[in-house]
Amino acid sequence: MRQPPGESDMAVSDALLPSFSTFASGPAGREKTLRQAGAPNNRWREELSHMKRLPPVLPGRPYDLAAATVATDLESGGAGAACGGSNLAPLPRRETEEFNDLLDLDFILSNSLTHPPESVAATVSSSASASSSSSPSSSGPASAPSTCSFTYPIRAGNDPGVAPGGTGGGLLYGRESAPPPTAPFNLADINDVSPSGGFVAELLRPELDPVYIPPQQPQPPGGGLMGKFVLKASLSAPGSEYGSPSVISVSKGSPDGSHPVVVAPYNGGPPRTCPKIKQEAVSSCTHLGAGPPLSNGHRPAAHDFPLGRQLPSRTTPTLGLEEVLSSRDCHPALPLPPGFHPHPGPNYPSFLPDQMQPQVPPLHYQGQSRGFVARAGEPCVCWPHFGTHGMMLTPPSSPLELMPPGSCMPEEPKPKRGRRSWPRKRTATHTCDYAGCGKTYTKSSHLKAHLRTHTGEKPYHCDWDGCGWKFARSDELTRHYRKHTGHRPFQCQKCDRAFSRSDHLALHMKRHF
């Protein structure tokens, strides 16, 4: 005997919830028989258990997708058999096709799995609690949630019911810790569908590029996990069912069977893209190709040239190879031999310091290349030239000299010529003939000034007003005149004092020492 519809049944009918008899693929009598037998006869439940897409709606049995999701939750909770309501009349076939064309199944599925409307959640929670208390279910009672939230029991394909205990043994996602499912479950299916976002979240899920995953290495039994880590972006709202647990699930293998797949839910807001950062080995870029880099301070010695001997060069000014190559007249350099190792030249003793060794870049050339040398005392770099006429390269801008075909031969150093290259001492030819003096001078003017000391002649007079001083030498008058003007040209470098005479400054500097 049917009872009159209650408030919960009216609310379900107002929300366009169909009868659960429409979910079966056969008539009502066959559906009742299959439900009593406990066989999984609902295709919608099977697709949810495998986390696959929803199949097309059966002809003649249209229903609302959101209502179907809520009804599946009620049946899994154990209240599906007792919940009654008004059945929706089937629509004609043409209207069914038009209705199915207007439905976006991917969008509805993703939104229904993420967060259902509060009104429908409250209605279904109240009806589920009332129905579960009135009539028992064939699969066993399940604890209804106290709050208006959903717990989606996603079970394996061959798990018809829930385990006794209230939370369900086959649950994959939930607030309470659930034991592993009884049936083997491959996470390759979850790799296609996000735990909480559906197919829409699949489009927003960032995956790591296989290029940036380290290569597979053989692992001992139980030695750890190496494989592909896929970061699942969880788009659930705060406080929802799938936003709280942070679980990393591991499958037995990837779709190709080479390595396991690890799925980690990400609850940190919108999905982020992983920056593709590739680390490469640091390579030294030199102008000489494969040879070692040359610095200004240390430079390898020269090897034997096939056309001549080594080239000596002085240490200063030390000019780097980069400066040589950056000059205007530089030639393209050739790569060094692969087996090159710098060592001091054989023609130089080992006791010389490194700075005294010849500073010529090591190069081996077989062929008819022209070698050229700079002037003695300047750094020389011999570079090959592929033309018929060679050119000498001396940094930065020394004159070029053409050499006959031959080898790089060092030139003999030539002595420099200058004004004071040889010592010249003037002889004192001017001697004072005054009795008892005997002084000699190199200049006649000095001797003439000296004779004034003997004769007492003072031809230099001070013309300052009121001053009648006379002097035998002009430099003495100049120093005297500074007393009237106050001019002190000799400044002390240690302090702020200045003097009018240089000898006075020399005496003053002895105090600082």
UniProtKB/Swiss-Prot annotation:
Which sequence ranges does the entry mark as zinc finger (C2H2-type)? Answer: 430-454, 460-484, 490-512
Question: Where does motif 9aaTAD map?
Answer: 101-109
- PROSITE patterns to which the protein is assigned, alphabetical: ZINC_FINGER_C2H2_1, ZINC_FINGER_C2H2_2
Describe how this enzyme or protein is applied in practice.
POU5F1/OCT4, SOX2, MYC/c-Myc and KLF4 are the four Yamanaka factors. When combined, these factors are sufficient to reprogram differentiated cells to an embryonic-like state designated iPS (induced pluripotent stem) cells. iPS cells exhibit the morphology and growth properties of ES cells and express ES cell marker genes.
Q: Which residues carry this modification: Phosphoserine?
A: S254
Q: Which UniProt keywords apply?
A: Activator, Cytoplasm, DNA-binding, Isopeptide bond, Metal-binding, Nucleus, Phosphoprotein, Repeat, Transcription, Transcription regulation, Ubl conjugation, Zinc, Zinc-finger
Q: Where is this cross-link: Glycyl lysine isopeptide (Lys-Gly) (interchain with G-Cter in ubiquitin)?
A: K32
Residue ranges for the region (Interaction with ZNF296) are 416-513
SMART domains listed in its UniProt record: ZnF_C2H2 (SM00355)
Q: Which SUPFAM superfamilies match?
A: beta-beta-alpha zinc fingers
Q: Which GO terms describe its molecular function?
A: beta-catenin binding; chromatin DNA binding; DNA-binding transcription activator activity, RNA polymerase II-specific; DNA-binding transcription factor activity; DNA-binding transcription factor activity, RNA polymerase II-specific; histone deacetylase binding; lncRNA binding; phosphatidylinositol 3-kinase regulator activity
What is a biological process (GO) this protein takes part in? negative regulation of ERK1 and ERK2 cascade
How this chain assembles, per its entry, is: Interacts with POU5F1/OCT4 and SOX2. Interacts with MUC1 (via the C-terminal domain). Interacts with MEIS2 isoform 4 and PBX1 isoform PBX1a. Interacts with ZNF296. Interacts with GLIS1. Interacts with BTRC; this interaction leads to KLF4 ubiquitination and subsequent degradation. Interacts with IPO7; the interaction facilitates nuclear translocation of KLF4 in dental papilla cells.
> What does the UniProt entry state concerning the protein's domains?
The 9aaTAD motif is a transactivation domain present in a large number of yeast and animal transcription factors.
User: Which PANTHER family does this chain map to?
Assistant: KRUEPPEL-LIKE FACTOR 4 (PTHR23235:SF117), KRUEPPEL-LIKE TRANSCRIPTION FACTOR (PTHR23235)
The name of this protein is: Krueppel-like factor 4
What does the record give as the organism's lineage?
Answer: Eukaryota, Metazoa, Chordata, Craniata, Vertebrata
